[in-house]
Regions:
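Hydrophobic/aromatic-rich alpha-helical bundle segments in the mid-to-C-terminal region
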Residues: 129-133, 150-211
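Amphipathic alpha-helical packing segments from all-alpha helical-bundle domains
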Residues: 74, 106-116, 126-152
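Hydrophobic alpha-helical connector segments
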Residues: 60, 64, 77-112, 162-169
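Generic hydrophobic, amphipathic alpha-helix propensity
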Residues: 11-23, 40, 65-69, 73, ...
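Short loop-to-helix capping motifs
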Residues: 57, 121-126
Length: 211
């Protein structure tokens, strides 16, 4: 067993973490992913060699940052959905359930801003778009069944596939959040938009047939 391996793994992990943190800080201050490797390395306190031992380029770095931030959002959303599926903690109405879900999310404006920039890049770069598509497909599979179950709790049945419902909800929320800088009622807009999408893609469940 190579006793030095755990230390090198920890060192590599710390290098990656600091590079991601530097990229996040630069994006927050500039609003763009068009950063130079030298600027990211200078912010993180590393050489170009350390950068390229972790990432093939700036695009891969920002995709990794997006995935890391998204993972935190999805994890909180999964837990919030599970809470709404539990009888002892569920809300009385679909709108209240949506409010609970959105209130449970971390302050993720930076992620939504980064996602918007990455989507704009994806529109002009098919290869870049393919990498983001894989990420979104995973989200749909993870969350789809939970959104179907949430609809069922409120006596509604989806008219689309579970993954499509989940993607539509995420798209609606991302779109509403993107308006936050110019929307003084941003939280209400997000709640109404997400609830409207769920209602629009579901119908009332049929009443049980009496025998």
């Amino acid at each position: 067993v190579n006793e030095g391996e755990p230390t090198s793994v920890r060192r590599r992990s710390e290098t990656r973490r600091r590079l991601l943190a530097a990229a996040a800080a630069l994006f927050e201050s500039t609003g763009t992913i068009s950063q130079r490797v030298e600027d990211i390395c200078g912010r993180a306190g590393f050489t170009r060699g350390a950068f390229y031992s972790n990432f093939t380029g700036v695009d891969q770095l920002y995709l990794a940052l997006h995935e890391e931030q998204a993972a935190r959002v999805w994890e909180r959303l999964r837990h919030a959905l599970d809470a709404q599926l539990a009888e002892e903690s569920r809300a009385d109405t679909l709108e209240d359930a949506v409010g609970f879900l959105l209130d449970s999310l971390p302050d993720s404006r930076e992620w939504f801003s980064l996602r918007s920039v990455l989507l704009a890049r994806a529109a002009a770069d098919p290869a870049f778009a393919a990498r983001m598509t894989l990420d979104d497909g995973h989200v749909g599979r993870e969350l789809g069944d939970r959104f179907v179950a949430l609809a069922a709790v409120h006596h509604r049945v989806p008219v689309v596939a579970a993954a499509v419902l989940a993607k539509a909800v995420v798209a609606a929320h991302v779109g509403a959040v993107s308006q936050s800088p110019v929307d003084v009622s941003g939280a209400l807009t997000q709640r109404l938009t997400v609830a409207a999408v769920i209602r629009g893609l579901t119908v009332e469940a049929a009443a049980p047939t009496r025998t």
